[in-house]
Design a protein with these regions (language model features):
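Peri-membrane helix termini and adjoining interfacial loops of integral membrane proteins
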Residues: 40-48, 125-136, 227-234, 276-283, ...
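Juxtamembrane helix-boundary/capping and inter-helix hinge elements in multi-pass membrane proteins
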Residues: 94-96, 171-176, 186-188, 227-230, ...
Length: 450
């Protein structure tokens, strides 16, 4: 691998400078403007901490932060508790229909938070199909609203991420380690907790960070089913909307608090991961085996049950999309009426929903490949800057990034708020870190030989 410690103004040097310029315009400038607004008195133009004092002195606002921590920590713990054992079962046992189950688990994590929350309202809302079923049997079950519902929806959407991370890490464990543990009398559940979990702990910490960040920044789920249980992103959005046309300082201060919190969580995770980091060399990967009769039935039951519950919202939404409706009420019969209505009334919105992500996807892939090449093959002081800049959006909640872009580009000469450009830019900046991580860890290895 080349080790170019000095910057050279060639083609790759120009690309490096251009990449830094793009980050400076669409990331650093909005974030700096956001921080400026959070400490600027709109009347006098002087420095002030009044907005931060307001947030921490009023229990209404401060409690939303506590609520978000409760939700995020609980969802993270449950996601780890579900995703890790599930990945272990998939790795060591032969399970019928495993390829289909793998696809379904990925699909379960793909729906937007709004869709997931809406789906569970149809199932466990006050008039949901499951709620009504048990009500007819004379059994009262908790509805989906409030803390429990938020945690349920987030967990079922996010445990697949832990599953994918853990499953990848389990492939790197040498089977001889597990065999040695079994020869010493450590097998089954004991082997899982004493041998397997410590070996994949760095990966689990990375997955936990991702789940925590996602759940902490989730706006759609608590907005739809939180009711009286208000979380940090909901209050941030509400305050920003209330301040549109006026001073946006308080919303900016809340956004800065979110950045500080997620940054601290990220740094703690990195510190703990580095303390527990070690290399795994899988000379003899774990081989799938048939479980004993009784265990085999239990394994299949657990796997099918977890995957079935996770995919249930998506399956039910697809099913109801074909049902006939009268207004907001489902009636007997099936047709494509709902699709015709949606395309007729929301054709332009559907078109934008397809075009904007596609444009962002093309740019993300191109930038990720370039950044991976620069970081791996053309490493110098400036490419290190590119590497750091590309990771900043990883720790910035999506709501915060959106507000920063709206505040930063809401006045001439950089007036692009309300345009397709700012939506594409937001998606690129927000999702680029995940693609960069992929390319710099895996695809970059191939670039080394170029």
């Amino acid at each position: 691998m080349k080790n170019n410690n000095k910057f050279r103004l060639d083609v790759w040097g120009a690309i490096t400078l251009g990449t830094i310029a793009l980050y400076a315009l669409f990331l650093l400038y909005p974030m700096a403007y956001l921080i400026r607004q959070s400490v600027l008195d709109p009347d006098t133009g002087s420095f002030t901490l009044a907005y931060f004092t307001k947030f921490f002195s009023k229990s209404y606002y401060f409690n939303t932060l506590i609520n978000s921590f409760k939700v995020s920590i609980t969802a993270t713990v449950l996601s780890i508790a579900i995703g890790t054992p599930l990945a272990y079962l998939f790795t060591i046992f032969k399970i019928k229909g495993k390829p289909v189950l793998n696809i379904l688990i990925v699909v379960a994590s793909m729906s937007a938070p709004f869709i997931g929350a809406y789906s569970w309202i149809l199932l466990l809302g006050r008039s949901g199909i499951i709620t009504t079923f048990f009500k007819n049997l004379g059994i009262a079950i908790p509805d989906i609203y409030g803390f429990g519902g938020i945690v349920l929806v987030m967990t079922l959407q996010l445990f697949p991420l832990v599953f994918l991370y853990a499953k990848g890490a389990l492939k790197n464990i040498d089977n001889s380690l597990i065999e040695a543990a079994e020869n010493l009398g450590c097998s089954g559940i004991a082997c899982f907790f004493k041998v397997v979990v410590p070996l994949i702990m760095p990966t689990l910490l990375a997955a936990a960070l991702l789940v925590f960040m996602r759940s902490f920044a989730d706006f759609g789920t608590p907005m739809l089913i939180g009711e009286g249980y208000r979380t940090f992103p909901v209050v941030l959005y509400t305050e920003f909307i209330n301040e549109v046309g006026g001073s946006d300082g308080f919303a900016a201060a809340i956004a800065v608090i979110a950045i500080v919190i997620t940054t601290l969580v990220f740094l703690v995770q990195k510190y703990v991961s580095n303390k527990n980091a070690f290399a795994l060399n899988s000379m003899h990967p774990v081989e799938e085996r048939e479980a004993r009769k009784g265990i085999n039935a239990l394994v299949h039951l657990v796997v099918y049950l977890v995957v079935g519950i996770a995919i249930m919202p998506q399956a039910y939404v697809i099913y109801t999309s074909f049902k006939n409706t009268q207004g907001k009420i489902f009636v007997d019969g099936y047709s494509l009426q709902s699709y015709q209505t949606a395309i007729g009334k929301l054709g332009r919105s559907i078109q934008n929903t397809i075009i904007i992500p596609l444009l962002a996807l093309v740019v993300i892939v191109l930038l990720a490949v370039l950044i991976a090449y620069l970081v791996v093959r053309r490493r110098n002081a400036l490419t290190n800057v590119v590497d750091i800049l590309s990771m900043i959006p990883y720790i910035v909640p999506g709501t915060v990034l959106g507000i920063a872009l709206l505040i930063g580009f809401n006045k001439p000469p950089l007036l692009i708020s309300g345009t397709m450009l700012i939506m594409v830019a937001a998606l690129i900046i927000r999702r680029l870190p995940y693609t960069c991580l992929l390319y710099t860890s895996d695809a970059a290895d191939d670039l080394i030989g170029v």
